[in-house]
């Protein structure tokens, strides 16, 4: 009764509250972007499905998304061996496609409110302070809501309808055909059947551990090749030669992939396979040997503050083979120093570039992630090709990037950023699919805050005309966006307003927190933190912020407050189309001229390199010849010196013997002459009582007397010069030397020479 007196608006006890009408969930940014699309296409290019994560299966989801949006690969998978008729495909999808309850979100919110109210009404139970409301902009919340609101597509094993045994290829074909045949543009795929086959055939994927996306890509492509070739070998030759009935689209696509028949087994090779040539030049004989090897993806080493072009240049740089890594030259017949380089001989249509972010370090004894800044372009032209390469000027465009988010190779998360045909770039994060801006792709060079880095880059071939057309379309879209931004500045009564005034009016609105906070400078982040959700979502879904750097007000110049000028901005003149065409033509001519200049510069560099190599070869040849001549002259000199040393060793003793014998004969001749002269003199008596000590000087005096008598009796020697001393007469110096020698011999005790001279003299006297 008391409640009734309080007011008439209070409900009665027995009254039943009115049931809320179910409201549809708010539109996602992807649904807003797909509003203006026409009827559903049969090729599946307008389907945008997420993939459910079954526990660390993000590596599989990101690679499968990149392969699906590769148009030639998707068409080749669907058309081999035959394309399933659309009627049977729709009948199968009617059983596997499950639509969720549209009121699931409302029921979940009502259940949460009821639980919250029940917890608040319990007496003595304080509210849980740690329980926080869910962040509706977080990827986890968006993934949960996608699972509750979007159609779920479960794939089934249809290998028997393809005439093949169950394999990874048939499971991949099941996924692609299910998406193409579905009547909904958005949804979620459950690749449970594919993961079961993967874990059945490969043990390394049976655990819930973190796996490498590049390893999975390489394994999947090789498995597809093996499965297709194994099934083709089972078919008889007659059946393989006859093309199966196909639709016109599949026949056109098979001819565009370069295959003669729709069911050829070479389509994987023609799309992803390239040919590398290893050139090795021996530095001794200068012979060049080549060895070819195929590749499905290119793995390039990374350097800090580099680009994909510089990494490819390093990939094809010359490597010196020396010391323990010498090259065995067949021409020289042994290990020789050589130069080795890798070049591309055949370019693939789809180029998968693996950036080697994980490197093994000896210090840590494990793999470590490299957070190097590596810039990758939207368009790429390879230069490290051979001279006889097929289509060396092929132009590539970036259409998919696999991003690794994490601090190491053993944990983390993979997402894919893919460029669709006509809906721009999309972010595929497991169950969540969101549109992103083109500049968002540049956030994963490796130098941004966070742990997100580009890991695998997918490039597909394109033409220069397509690139110019795309740039023109982007310019038109940017001009249209600028015009729409100018229109939003106008007031409802038609008068324009300055953006600065709008900003001031927005900033002057006080809030309760501002009143409680002391006045001062507010801290504004200078670099927004990277994330994979609301920061890069659709601008239309984000709330308007006049101070945001992405606001159109901050990108456009102020408009003067004149109504006539506003109308001119809103309606561009008719000559803009002609001006755009003129600019496009000038841009095309400039690109062509730039291409010609690049070709001329490339030719000039090649000629300069050829001249430098020729000069280097000539200098090396001259140096080699000089070394050979030096070695030959040194060998000749060594032989001559060894020959002379040998002769001197052989004739040394004989020459000394000859000289010794000549001097001995000269002395004997002199002694003989002395004896002949002394024989004419009368004998001199020798006292018997004289001792050896007295005999010494007496004999010397007698010898001097005999020599004087001999000089008087002998005729003069006319051959001797008049001033020269006589031969028989000793000089004073010679006499002193003889006496000195005799005294020395006497002092040293060697008296044999003295006795010999006395004996000789005595014999001469007696004779």
Curated annotation (Swiss-Prot):
Ubiquitin thioesterase component of the regulatory network controlling carbon source utilization through ubiquitination and deubiquitination involving creA, creB, creC, creD and acrB. Deubiquitinates the creA catabolic repressor and the quinate permease qutD. Also plays a role in response to carbon starvation and the control of extracellular proteases activity. One of its GO terms (biological process) is carbon catabolite repression of transcription. This is Probable ubiquitin carboxyl-terminal hydrolase creB. It comes from the Eukaryota. Residues 656-667, 750-767 have a biased composition (Basic residues). Signal peptide: none annotated. Belongs to the peptidase C19 family. Keywords: Coiled coil, Hydrolase, Protease, Thiol protease, Ubl conjugation pathway. Residues 49-462 form the USP domain. Residues 250-263, 690-700 have a biased composition (Polar residues). InterPro entries: Papain-like_cys_pep_sf, Peptidase_C19, Peptidase_C19_UCH, USP_CS, USP_dom. Residues 577-650, 731-749 have a biased composition (Basic and acidic residues). Residues 574-641 form a coiled coil. The lineage of its organism: Eukaryota, Fungi, Dikarya, Ascomycota, Pezizomycotina. Its EC number is 3.4.19.12. Interacts with creA, creC and qutD. The keyword Manganese does not apply. Residues 107-140, 232-263, 490-767 are annotated as: Disordered. Residues 540-554, 564-573, 701-713 have a biased composition (Low complexity).
């Amino acid at each position: 009764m008391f409640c009734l007196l309080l007011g008439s608006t209070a409900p009665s006890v027995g009254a039943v509250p009115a049931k809320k009408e179910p409201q549809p969930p708010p539109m996602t940014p992807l649904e807003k972007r797909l509003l203006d699309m026409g009827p559903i296409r049969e090729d599946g290019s307008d389907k945008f499905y997420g993939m459910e994560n079954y526990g660390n299966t993000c590596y599989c989801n990101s690679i499968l998304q990149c392969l699906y949006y590769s148009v030639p690969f998707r068409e080749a998978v669907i058309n081999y061996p035959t394309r399933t008729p659309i009627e049977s495909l729709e009948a199968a999808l009617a059983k596997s496609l499950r639509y969720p309850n549209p009121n699931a979100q409302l029921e979940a919110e009502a259940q949460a409110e009821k639980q919250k109210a029940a917890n608040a009404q319990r007496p003595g139970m304080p509210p849980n302070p740690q329980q926080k409301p869910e962040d509706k902009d977080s990827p986890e919340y968006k993934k949960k809501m996608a699972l509750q609101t979007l159609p779920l597509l479960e794939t089934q094993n249809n290998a028997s309808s393809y005439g093949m045994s169950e394999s990874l290829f048939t499971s991949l074909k099941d996924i692609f055909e299910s998406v193409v045949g579905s009547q909904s543009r958005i949804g979620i795929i459950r690749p449970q059947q594919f993961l079961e086959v993967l874990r059945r055939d490969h043990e390394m994927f049976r655990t819930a551990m973190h796996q490498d996306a590049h390893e999975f890509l390489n394994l999947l492509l090789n498995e597809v090749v093996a499965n297709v070739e194994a099934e083709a070998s089972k078919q008889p030759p007659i059946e393989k030669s006859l093309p199966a009935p196909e639709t016109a689209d599949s026949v056109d696509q098979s001819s565009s992939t370069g295959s003669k028949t729709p069911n050829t087994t070479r389509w994987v090779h023609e799309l992803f396979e390239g040919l590398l040539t290893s050139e090795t030049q021996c530095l001794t004989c200068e012979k060049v040997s080549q060895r070819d090897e195929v590749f499905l993806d290119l793995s390039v080493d990374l350097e800090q503050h580099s680009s994909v072009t510089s990494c490819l240049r390093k990939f094809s740089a010359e490597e010196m083979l020396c010391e323990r890594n010498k090259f065995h030259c067949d021409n020289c017949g042994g290990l020789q120093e050589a130069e080795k380089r890798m070049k591309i001989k055949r370019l693939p249509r789809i180029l998968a570039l693996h950036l080697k972010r994980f490197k093994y370090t000896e210090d840590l004894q494990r793999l470590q992630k490299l957070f190097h800044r590596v810039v990758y372009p939207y368009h790429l032209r390879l230069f490290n090709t051979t001279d006889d390469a097929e289509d060396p000027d092929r132009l590539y465009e970036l259409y998919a990037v696999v991003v690794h988010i994490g601090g190491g190779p053993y944990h983390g998360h993979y997402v894919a950023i893919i460029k669709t045909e006509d809906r721009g770039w999309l972010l595929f994060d497991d169950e969540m699919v969101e549109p992103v801006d083109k500049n968002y792709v540049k956030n994963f060079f490796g130098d941004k805050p966070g742990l997100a880095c580009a890991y695998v880059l997918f490039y597909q071939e394109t033409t220069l005309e397509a690139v110019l057309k795309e740039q023109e379309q982007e310019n038109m879209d940017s001009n249209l966006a600028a015009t729409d931004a100018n229109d939003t500045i106008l007031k409802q009564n038609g008068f324009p307003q300055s953006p600065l005034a709008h900003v001031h009016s927005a900033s002057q609105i006080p809030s309760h927190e501002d009143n409680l906070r002391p006045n001062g400078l507010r801290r504004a982040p200078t670099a927004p933190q990277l994330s994979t959700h609301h920061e890069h979502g659709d601008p239309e879904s984000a709330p308007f912020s006049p101070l945001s750097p992405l606001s159109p007000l901050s990108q456009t110049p102020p408009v003067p407050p004149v109504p006539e000028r506003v109308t001119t901005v809103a309606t561009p003149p008719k000559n803009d189309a002609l001006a755009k065409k003129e600019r496009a033509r000038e841009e095309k001519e400039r690109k062509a001229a730039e291409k010609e200049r690049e070709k001329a510069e490339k030719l000039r560099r090649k000629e300069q390199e050829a001249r430098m190599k020729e000069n280097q070869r000539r200098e090396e040849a001259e140096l080699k010849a000089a070394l050979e001549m030096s070695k030959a002259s040194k060998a000749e000199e060594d032989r001559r010196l060894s020959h002379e040393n040998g002769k001197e060793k052989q004739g040394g003793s004989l020459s000394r013997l000859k000289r010794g014998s000549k001097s001995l004969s000269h002395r004997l001749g002199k002694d003989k002459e002395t004896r002949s002269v002394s024989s004419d003199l009368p004998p001199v008596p020798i006292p018997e009582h004289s001792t050896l000590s007295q005999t010494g000087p007496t004999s010397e005096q007698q010898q001097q007397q005999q020599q004087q008598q001999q000089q008087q009796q002998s005729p003069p020697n006319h051959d001797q010069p008049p001033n020269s001393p006589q031969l028989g007469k000793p000089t004073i110096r010679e006499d002193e030397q003889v006496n000195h020698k005799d005294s020395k011999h006497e002092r040293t005790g060697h008296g044999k020479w003295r006795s010999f001279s006395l004996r000789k003299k005595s014999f001469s006297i007696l004779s």
